[in-house]
Amino acid sequence: MLRRPKVSPELDPSTLSNYGDFIVHKTQLDLAVDFDKNRVSSCVSLNVTNRTNTHQVVLDSSYLVIHSASINGISTPFDVAERQTLGSKVTIKIPPEMKISELTITIESETTYECTALQFLPAEATDGGVGPYLFSQCQAIHARSLFPCFDTPAVKCPYEMSVTSPYPSVMSGRPLGVSGNMYRFSQPVPIPSYLVAVASGDIKSAPIGPRSSVYCEPLKLEVCQHEFQADMEHFLQAAESLVFKYEWERYDALVLPSSFPYGGMENPNITFVTPTLISGDRENVDVIAHELAHSWSGNLVTNCSWEHFWLNEGWTVYLERRILGKLHGNATRDFSAIIGWTDLENSIAAMGPSAERWSMLVHNLKDGSDPDDAFSTVPYEKGSTLLYHIETLIGQEKFDKFIPHYFHTFRYKSLDTYQFIDCLYSFFADFKSVLDTIDWESWLYKPGMPPVKPDFDTSMVDQCYQLADKWYHHSLKNKFHKFSSEDIKSFTANQSVVFLDTLIAFDKLDFKWKHHLDALNTMASVYQEYSKSTNAEVLFRWYVLQVTGHNQEYYSRLGEWLGTVGRMKFVRPGYVLLNKVDRSMALHYFEKFHNRYHAICKSMVRRDWDLIKTK
């Protein structure tokens, strides 16, 4: 049974604005970067229609200093409310004599030290060390700390943007040109505020396809170009064959400095990605398939609120794996899904009691909770598994016809779960009885794992499990003569990830690797390529396995490596593990490298340690 709201799409509870009173036609956003003060000033103009004849405009803000506000060129009084979890309301009075409904609302503001959307890096925290660097991350509700706005995915409009900076700059739009230190961009496709992005620093670019370039610090330009140029256009063409023509003109990627704490962000026209994708073996570039898929799911068709985040991420993971299937075969698609299923199990288990709230597909944020609190693997993996299940019931050939229909229907729009389901039932009217077999109540509202597990092709994962089991049983006997480097010679990086994850998981049972150091040392001798790997996903797990087994020579190796990455996926569990085996060493390396980390990353590591101390 569906718990339908009275109106769809339902209102976004994570904005303080009165966005429902206005139609936003266009936004002009002009930014200026001050690297001396680590501040960004903004002038934003919203062209709107006052559809309800309201007497005030209420915008979202957070940690901003508001300098002025005007409507249709007339200076207007404004009020900034006290900050709460979701920020501070900015209320601008519409002059009573202003009877027209077409308004241009202009606000000048400046960020503060507490801005959650921006990260300023000193030169020493960049890879090249030439100068400072700035990048933004506005998802989910951090755009309001960069400029006042209707900060909700329910509001989408075209943008004209500029940034003035002493260093080369990019934004989430099509480059229009440079005038002195001013870089101008246009985004004609309607986007929500969370997709506004800016980066500025020692940035160069190189082509990686007929409609793609990679941007990064000059020091890494050649290796980044090599990593992406063989696959980028293939990804684009595979995605277009699934949905429809790519609408954003260019698909570029910005590889950020090592201190970037995230995996990637699907900013339109220029995806921001972690440098840990650059492995030298092109094994991690499949991550680009995910960010590219966002060009349709999330960017073109958007969840109306963060309660329905699975519509963005579930669809994106589904499309990502379909792209991989087209390029590498269905066994690869299912292999990725199996890894995702395991990640989902681990994620829900790690939630503890909070899984009762945060492991359901449709969230309830109506109590004013921060959407970041709800962030997990659930919308990605549980959402994509639901779509896989629907595809299985309907049949892939028939479901493939629904994909472009869905994205055409909601193109440029924001929707909720119920509109998706209505669209599904409308398109498959002849399959109503089949769709009715889906336990929508459990899929959407019940916590825990999905009610149905697809019948995945396990051929690629079976090899990993079999080798791991072999090591387990031979470790018990202390006999290792049957292993050689040939065991893993044909493994992809992801297969090595599964193999190592399986070995690590054994330690959670009665078996403990610290009692089998001979096995770990033999493994290091036989599989020498793991210690030499440039693939962050593989190398991290290799270190985790060895340190979990109290192989002390790897403690300092892990500690030094944590100084070369800033991605929280590795940094947080890396320090937690090091802290468990040698707290003084963990503190030493954190003190040595903490200035290289993002502020959020530093605070999360400290929080992790506090949790450990209070257990």
From Swiss-Prot:
Record note on cofactor: Binds 1 zinc ion per subunit.
GO molecular function: aminopeptidase activity; epoxide hydrolase activity; metallopeptidase activity; zinc ion binding
Organism of derivation: Meyerozyma guilliermondii (strain ATCC 6260 / CBS 566 / DSM 6381 / JCM 1539 / NBRC 10279 / NRRL Y-324)
Cofactor(s) of this protein: Zn(2+)
Pfam families per record: Leuk-A4-hydro_C, Peptidase_M1, Peptidase_M1_N
Binding site for Zn(2+): H290, H294, E313
EC number: 3.4.11.-, 3.3.2.10
Record: residues binding substrate: Q137, C138, Q139, P261, Y262, G263, G264, M265, E266
Keyword Ligase assigned: no
The reaction(s) this protein catalyses: an epoxide + H2O = an ethanediol
Entry's localization field: Cytoplasm; Nucleus
Described purpose of this protein according to its UniProt entry: Aminopeptidase that preferentially cleaves di- and tripeptides. Also has low epoxide hydrolase activity (in vitro). Can hydrolyze the epoxide leukotriene LTA(4) but it forms preferentially 5,6-dihydroxy-7,9,11,14-eicosatetraenoic acid rather than the cytokine leukotriene B(4) as the product compared to the homologous mammalian enzyme (in vitro).
Active-site residue numbers: E291 (proton acceptor), Y380 (proton donor)
Superkingdom of this protein's organism: Eukaryota
Swiss-Prot/TrEMBL keywords: Cytoplasm, Hydrolase, Metal-binding, Metalloprotease, Nucleus, Protease, Zinc
UniProt protein name: Leucine aminopeptidase 2-1
GO process terms (BP): peptide catabolic process; proteolysis
Gene Ontology CC entries for this record: cytosol; nucleus
Keyword Manganese: no
Taxonomic lineage from the root: Eukaryota, Fungi, Dikarya, Ascomycota, Saccharomycotina
Annotated family: Belongs to the peptidase M1 family.
